[in-house]
Amino acid sequence: MASSAPAWVPYEPTRDCSQGLCSMYCPQWCYFIFPPPPPFDVAGTSADDSSGPVFSPLVIAIIGVLASAFLLVSYYTFISKYCGTVSSLRGRVFGSSSGGAAYGGGAGSGGRHGHGQSRSHESWNVSPPSGLDETLINKITVCKYRRGDGFVHTTDCSVCLGEFSDGESLRLLPRCSHAFHQQCIDTWLKSHSNCPLCRANITFVTVGLASPEPEGCAPGETGGDNTHEVVVVMDGLENLCEEQQEAVSRASTADDDHDAKDVAEGMEEANGAAEIREEGSPPKRGASSFDLHRDNRMCIADVLQESMEDELTAARESGLLAGGAGTSRRCHGENSKGRGGRSRRALQLQDAMEALPGKRLPSGGRSCFSSKSGRGKDSDHPM
């Protein structure tokens, strides 16, 4: 049995292995039998893990800060754009609706009129999209600045931030009364329709001047082109009859100059005014018609003041002051029988006016008288 075992070749170590005579016991060929041991890793990590990218905490922090900043900027841009679009759209809608209610001239009816009226109170806070015309800008009040006069409360212009100097032309806006340099505010109003300081809209309300038609005056027929109509507007019709009746009674019982002076003083205590307007054509509506009526208007006391002293002097010299008043009253008493429909108050008013025509009438109510130039007698005086 022992002889059948293979005999091993004795190992003879040689240091020169290049000749190929090395045996299997040579350390160079040991890897054919056993695999080589793994290499020793000092860091404790495998070769696969060490081959991947390594991120430091500083890089991660920088990336996080940049991402947060980007998100905040994007959010701010989106919100500002969205909110600005909504606010401008809302302003246009509210501005158009309130402007239509203010300048529509009553196009809506019923509840829609009340809704437009409520919107008109808020319309001055909404900025219109366009500016004003040059004609409207020129209608705004222009004044000269004087330091210390109290007319302009501010001392500088809010547009150019420059101070006002004496003699400069300033514009006062109609609603808020803020003052600005004329050139500065004109440039601003060409692209804006509101005040640059308080944002109040600059609105112009056109008020039509209607021709003053006296109350209580019955419409009469026109006699042609030569019709001359005189309208007397009197104030104080309520207390006029009693005072005029008292004055006439004083005049009828006065026998000397002292009584005549008392009558004159009693009539002047009325403290009234009457206005007379002469109209040669039907009144036209507008500012020109208003100026025409104002030019043709005069006070009865101013017209008859000059003849007052002459009439009193003539009455005292002739001694017919009391008799004249009584005769006037009797004549009107006889004529009153044929005046169907006239009131007692109108007769007393006419008697008092004819007795002392130079006196002023008290203030209070309103009445009117109209007469035609082609009539010989006084026309009826509707009350």
From Swiss-Prot:
Domain of life (superkingdom): Eukaryota
Originating species: Oryza sativa subsp. japonica
Record's function text: Possesses E3 ubiquitin-protein ligase in vitro.
UniProt-listed CDD domains: RING-H2_EL5-like (cd16461)
GO terms for cellular component: membrane
Coiled coil (residue ranges): none
Catalytic activities: S-ubiquitinyl-[E2 ubiquitin-conjugating enzyme]-L-cysteine + [acceptor protein]-L-lysine = [E2 ubiquitin-conjugating enzyme]-L-cysteine + N(6)-ubiquitinyl-[acceptor protein]-L-lysine
Record field: transmembrane: 53-73
Keywords for the protein's UniProt record, in alphabetical order: Membrane, Metal-binding, Transferase, Transmembrane, Transmembrane helix, Ubl conjugation pathway, Zinc, Zinc-finger
Protein's recorded name: E3 ubiquitin-protein ligase Os04g0590900
Keyword match Lipoprotein: no
InterPro entries noted in UniProt: ATL1/ATL16-like, Znf_RING, Znf_RING/FYVE/PHD
